[in-house]
Amino acid sequence: MSILYILLSLLLWGLIHSLLASLAFKSFLANLFGKSLMRGYRLFYNIFSLLSFLPILWPVATLPDALLYSVPAPISYAMILGQGAAAVLLILGVLQTDTLSFVGLRQLVEEEKPAALVTRGLYRLVRHPLYTAGLLFLWLSPQVTVNSFTLYVAATIYIFIGAYFEERKLLREFGEVYAEYKSRIPMLIPWLRFQ
């Protein structure tokens, strides 16, 4: 029952998260409330996404569970270091974008400008370094239970689906420039060409 509850929770979160991120929904809101109110949308979206994800973590931690595996030391220490490195990569990936725009603060004080395609730093290695870092952080967990494994699998599937739809959005937004970038740079794993 725990697995089903976690999967349904993440599915519901993913559907809401994806709907709120869609261009069609944002366009609908802009028509309904006007462009000026949309200046705070990115910040609202980020705060809502974070806060609405917390209730998913609660059942993972509190519902009946069983240990799947626990990696012994010293390998577990290396995995924890890997998680730390993944967290650093996540922060670097955000910093290599327009961080204030990414979190939604710049839009509060300035008129939103067309986004620029970031292809430097970590984005020279993979097209989605934030997803790569997130996947590394999840799967380098040295202790995994049935509940956490369920969350990791579902989150991984959601990340791949999200990357697919984000790619389509980026192709619409940047056209040939993104198509050329996509042809040169792997999606998630550096130096792996078939992505």
Language model feature labels by segment:
Residues 2-16, 112-195:
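Hydrophobic transmembrane alpha-helices
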Residues 9-23, 55, 83-105, 152-171:
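Transmembrane alpha-helical segments that form the membrane-embedded catalytic/substrate-channel core
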Residues 18-36:
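Membrane-interface helix-loop junction between the first two transmembrane segments
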Residues 28-32, 61-73:
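Membrane-interface helix termini and inter-helical loops of multi-pass transporters
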Residues 31-48:
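Loop-to-helix transition at the N-terminal end of transmembrane alpha-helices
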